[in-house]
Amino acid sequence: MNPFWSMSTSSVRKRSEGEEKTLTGDVKTSPPRTAPKKQLPSIPKNALPITKPTSPAPAAQSTNGTHASYGPFYLEYSLLAEFTLVVKQKLPGVYVQPSYRSALMWFGVIFIRHGLYQDGVFKFTVYIPDNYPDGDCPRLVFDIPVFHPLVDPTSGELDVKRAFAKWRRNHNHIWQVLMYARRVFYKIDTASPLNPEAAVLYEKDIQLFKSKVVDSVQVCTARLFDQPKIEDPYAISFSPWNPSVHDEAREKMLTQKKKPEEQHNKSVHVAGLSWVKPGSVQPFSKEEKTVAT
């Protein structure tokens, strides 16, 4: 029998007995009732123990915070955006081309037009970390070590970390590294040099420094037509002037440059009264046409 119902029945019985005794004048207090002990139902024999549901494993993430499976696409998009910025900046005398085999490697060349390194043509390679843009700053290595205080005389690597001690995402860009590589040839810095000899000569014997710079420029020019160190279809290479090939390309470039200028001149020409004859600088040289009346 259900204990709840049995307890209710006994209570009714006790209540009726008390009422009868009250009618006869005999008051009797009932003893204190004790609550029945609560028990959990027995566990069935074939029941399985209840366990806490396991939470799904966290999705693998790359170092830049994106899902690991999206990492290559995110990196490719970042590098494409960086190259677009380089093109828009139009850095004077600096040309770069991403590698065919790896987007993390760019080939480039710097043309120095004036200053101590005038007429210098320096080829280089930019190495971008595989966790870009969250890693260290890109490395820039010249194909031939240039005699410069900030260029390692053995490896040819430029001290880029001097300007980018900590690479900051969404703040630093590769075009800034290229601009820095160009600027070091116009503004010489000798503090904490990678080439101590070049730094000392620049500070104490500028003439000898200039002589060594000229020698370095000549070496780079003499080896300009050498095959690229890295075998890649997009590596930058130079060849001697060939009129049958280069003359036509030169004319096309000059023609494309003249057309915008001609269109601009036509657009700014305004028709109106003038007292100067075309081709003359003398005032009132234009003949007036009389109208017959």
Curated annotation (Swiss-Prot):
Subcellular location: Cytoplasm; Cell membrane
Modified residues (Phosphoserine): S30
Subunit structure: Component of the FTS/Hook/FHIP complex (FHF complex), composed of AKTIP/FTS, FHIP1B, and one or more members of the Hook family of proteins HOOK1, HOOK2, and HOOK3. Interacts directly with HOOK1, HOOK2 and HOOK3. The FHF complex associates with the homotypic vesicular sorting complex (the HOPS complex). Also interacts with AKT1. May interact with FHIP1A.
Organismal lineage: Eukaryota, Metazoa, Chordata, Craniata, Vertebrata
Basic and acidic residues composition-biased segments: 14-23, 253-265
Species: Pongo abelii (Sumatran orangutan)
Protein family: Belongs to the ubiquitin-conjugating enzyme family. FTS subfamily.
Residues spanning the membrane: none
Gene for this chain: AKTIP
Protein name per UniProt: AKT-interacting protein
Example GO biological process: protein localization to perinuclear region of cytoplasm
CDD domains referenced in this protein's UniProt entry, alphabetically: UEV_AKTIP
Disordered: annotated segments: 1-63, 253-293
Domain of life: Eukaryota
UBC core domain: residues covered: 74-222
Keywords: Apoptosis, Cell membrane, Cytoplasm, Membrane, Phosphoprotein, Protein transport, Transport
Membrane topology: Peripheral membrane protein
Keyword Magnesium: no
